[in-house]
Regions:
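Concave beta-strand-loop units of leucine-rich repeat
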Residues: 30-31, 40-143
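Post-signal peptide N-terminal segment of mature Sec-exported envelope proteins
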Residues: 16-41
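Bacterial signal peptide processing site
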Residues: 7-11
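Bacterial N-terminal signal peptides
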Residues: 1-4
Length: 143
């Protein structure tokens, strides 16, 4: 079976050309990687191991009812995390095995609803995590 990703420059995806459509998200995540609420809004998205780039997070951030976002083993880095600020319902994010550093944690600090953050292994430091925890009291950070 082959998938053609509309709006992507290559079959590998992750080019930042997602277009923001649900079809693109569904093709990337697959049926098991997406959960919706009773109004059809995406609340859970698992894109772990997929060809997701920083620019793709702008499309993901349009889904403001998102509560859980799994981006482990993707091409996401610090710049992409700036797009996540509109996700005021986001509770859990996994950024394990990504290029995230302390600079990216500053963007996550703006997502006040976060309760669990998975960052192992990444390039974050103890100091960066301490700063994040100070900005988000009660957040659990695993790194």
């Amino acid at each position: 079976m082959a998938f053609v990703l509309v709006g992507c420059d290559s079959p590998q995806g992750g080019t930042g050309n997602s277009g923001g459509g649900d079809e693109w998200l569904l093709s990337q995540a697959g049926e098991a990687g997406v959960k919706k609420d009773n109004r059809g809004r995406i609340t859970y998205l698992d894109l772990s191991g997929k060809a997701i780039a920083n620019a793709d997070l702008a499309a993901i951030a349009k889904h403001t009812q998102l509560r859980e976002l799994y981006l482990a083993k993707t091409g996401v880095g610090d710049e992409g995390l700036a797009h996540l600020r509109p996700l005021t319902n986001l509770r859990i994010i996994s950024l394990a095995n990504t290029q995230v550093t302390d600079a990216g944690l500053k963007h996550l600090a703006a997502v006040r609803s976060l309760r669990q953050i998975f960052l192992y292994p990444t390039k974050v430091t103890d100091a960066g995590v301490a700063e994040l925890k100070a900005a988000l009291p009660g957040v659990q950070v695993r790194y």
